[in-house]
Amino acid sequence: MTTVEHPSPRSGLSDPELYINRELSWLEFNQRVLHLAQDPDIPLLERCKFMAIFSSNLDEFFMVRVAAVQDAQASGRPSSTPDALPREDVLQGIGLRVQELVRRQGAIWRRELQPLLADAGIRIAAFDRLSEHERVAIEERFEREVYPVLTPLAVGPGLPFPYISGLSLNLGLTVRDPIENEVRFARIKVPPRLPRFLAAGDVLVPLESVIEHHVDRLFPGMEVVDTVQFRVTRDADYAISDESDDLLGAVEAQIRRRRFGHVVRLEVADDAPADLVRQLSDSLGVRQQDVYRVPLPLDFTGLWQLASKDRPDLRDEPWDAPREPWLTSDGDPIDIFAAIRRGDLLVHHPYDDFEASVERFVEQAVADPSVLAIKQTMYRTSGDSPIVPALIRAAEQGKQTVCLVEVQARFDEQNNIQWERKLERSGVHVVYGLAGLKTHAKLAMVIRREGDRVRRYVHIGTGNYNPTTARIYTDLGLFTCREDVAEDVANLFNYITGFARQPAYEQVLVAPTYLREGLVGEIDRVAEAHRQGTPGRIAIKCNAMLDGEVIRALFRASQAGVPIQMIVRSIAGLRPGVPGVSETIELRSIVGRYLEHARIFAFTSGGETRAWIGSADMMVRNLDKRVELVTPVDDPALLDELMAIIEVQLADTALAWQLRSDGTWFRVQPRSGERPLNSQDELMRRAAARA
């Protein structure tokens, strides 16, 4: 347990002991995800889904964050993180914690989920555990579907060690020629386009188990000495030069290079022969500390196949978001522009219907002959999104249509490039983003002629224009036609699409120029008033709290006695509850059915609350290296809605975790005799009651 000395006011607020390492904090977030796979109150297939999410999260963590730490260590660059933990210690801490977590994941699978699935009629079994009838069925599928696509690749004279694609599942083998007594290494890639599990009646057999049982078929006349299942993770991070004059070309080049990034992790079965593992690590250039022995099966992302099974009895009850009363009239969609003219509107997804609000906003703009122009940002979207076809129709109708497609959105670059080309071919004015800055702001603007004037309608969100994630991420959106906010948003669009310095903004806070300064100013304002006897309170909900300047401002506010409550889903880089520094700070995390993605920044002084929502998290990358926007929410009724969201999550005793000053987390429990309060269930209940 870490204890923190009481630093002197202000001068000691940069003491590394007050901060928690980013990478190690993220691993604790993923531990909270894994905990959901153990929760007996969660339906069985949803628990399998959380196993897959945990593994998918971990893959991306290695591809981006671990790769970055390894690169920084190799370059010898001095560490600039607030915690000042040496990179060697960070990597060692990652290795130990990851090994612990993946072993726990394997135990959850073997001891809990696999037996429960069998009880529910979904039996998972290795090939050698099948009945004769089941073996025959799998043999037939192997010959018909699997064997034709397998390609054994041996290593020897004229046969170099094969390229191993990132995140692919493989079998490594040593094969001996009984006549020549020559031993060679060979590799078989488990085909990624085939189902991870093959069905034989009511039993599912892992594909790698089927292939491993049939390796003799691929090496006739040879003796297979040893086999090992293995998987590699490659560096997928990249940076685009600020000087690049062809952003699209630079991104496409980096996507091609990503396939050949250096190996940052080698996973092998925990019973893998040591000499075979050594041969693999030497051939791949992997250090021993980057080799992870893990329980089978490797790669639990394959459980997405199970999680999608049509078993309603083993899944969450479906949630069909009701339509807010202002969204319908006698069951029919209303004129959304007329509704916005009556006053600002706030939507909270998935509790409020994304289709009936955000999609309706764009669709109505396309169909409305009075609309002159539509402008929108697009960071991530889905293949079935109706928004892209709507923008294309708008351009084809002659409306001025502008779409900023962020081609640097990590792991969505290729998808976004395809959307960009489709939009551009249809006459949409497409902007790629800014070199050196990712445009992460979530904005849509509709310019409409009304009589002898032109009015601008704006949607400002915390989440992507993506109907798929809108069903599983919690996000907020503000609709407004306030002239001051609309003018700010128009100026930001012009800054991004044109050639100008970033302007000053009247209402919104925009990164990378003004956002940090604005939020720190609000924190300091509340703190100073509190010192002078005007009671204050700060409430923040975000995905990550890591920025040193913001954290130090919160420490100063805590030293002034301001109660500070934070709901941080993922990375929390500060220690709350430290005497003399952060003792009035309470930091929680909500992890549940929906991924908490909304950002709220609320500052109360003397009973008056000022609040903002928007796209930014409190990280250096968001505040210095992205175009972000947060907007004030001024309407008293909407402010009440925002604070109600915060209050119900602060009262959560079912999904909430709380951070101690020593950096450990504990589950928040209900008081004796009280029923647990699940904030996500409560928000669904409230949404249904409003409809």
Predicted regions, residues:
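N-terminal localization/anchoring segments of enzymes in phospholipid and broader phosphate metabolism
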Residues: 1-538, 556-560, 572-691
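Active-site glycine- and acidic-residue-rich loops that bind
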Residues: 548
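Hydrophobic alpha/beta core scaffold segments
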Residues: 563-567
